[in-house]
Amino acid sequence: MNDIRISVIGLGYVGLPLACLFANKYPVIGFDINKDRVSKLMSGVDSTLEISEEALKSVIRTNEKDTIKNNGLYCKSDLDKIKKCNYYIITVPTPVDINNRPDLSPLIKASQIIAAVISKGDYVIFESTVYPGATEENCIPVIENISKLKLNIDFFVGYSPERINPGDKNHTVEKIKKVTSGSNVESAINIDNLYKSVIIAGTHLAPSIKVAEAAKVIENCQRDINIAFVNELAKIFHLMNIDTHDVLEAAGSKWNFLPFKPGLVGGHCIGVDPFYLAQKAQEFGYHPEIILTGRRLNDSMGGYVANQIIKLMIKKGNTIKSQNVLILGFTFKENCPDIRNTKVIDIYNELVDFGTKVHVYDPWANPNDIKHVYGIDPISTLDGLKKYKAIILAVGHDEFKNIDLNIIKDNDCIVYDVKAFFEKNIVDERL
């Protein structure tokens, strides 16, 4: 493990924590095409809030030469700066298009970038979630064609799927076991040893790249399907006038009952990755029923929640048109500023279609990002001057634990709790 110089391509929710971890032991050059992002990181500011200012500044090096000679992190958007590295780790996003088909363009672009800078003997490791076969069928040919180097002769490839949990300060990257793999036996061992040197939870060396790819994608498919199951239960038990969370608590008294809760499934992983496996399955002539059914059910929950809210308002004798409605939380999960693929937007849009005046409050999300991506101007404070006929707890941010709903409730206000976050006795209904 001598003379290792690492470049992490993509410095977002996945890449930055990984780069910082490696920077404690190795020279690391972080690369991102977003120049503003790079500039802020070099000044010690992480807008994703995954890395504290103190932790970031402890590894950031302002002099590139110091980084190459010693451990530390130097961030750039200049390709020439990463040519001196010999391990390239790709952590770019893998989204879907408007038709929910896999969009590999960020991954292909990253492969092209790497192909322009790698030398003989270098390693390329992919962490982005993909369908089984993507690394070998889509990425490696790009690198070979551009670089004119040959796999397992001139360069080596590995796949080690990311397991970052944004917003979770307990299960950080070094505390989560890492699956590793390589394009041949020697490269697999070297890649496994690289991760093993910084991951205190240890590693699991998979027998092939495809196995590692498949392992990652089914992790998220499994979670998506399990949430879809309890979301369906929530719909059924609502019709029976039974509280779903009371049922889950009772069932959870058995040791082997899996603890999943109903809710919105958004973000860049769980709500996206099942489409990757489904697409690949269809290429082999198999139509995956459970995977796609789970996706459809989970994608329906925003509209379902909005309709339940409207029904509750009508039951209390409220008119719907032009009534003030407040949504607490807009990010795709709690205690995280990430608004990518948030399903709270489905609640918002449905309520707007009903004619209500919907206000969004989220202390974690960047208001400029919400405006830019979704065209919504969130409110900046809950001052009690505006009263609401309906309040929806959509995201369980810690900041909402001590909120006094009475200050912002109008007469005959209904409170709907998507997350079973508040005490049961202060809400009208929970999912």
Model-predicted regions and their roles:
Residues 1-431:
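Structural/interface elements that position substrates and couple domains in central-metabolism enzymes
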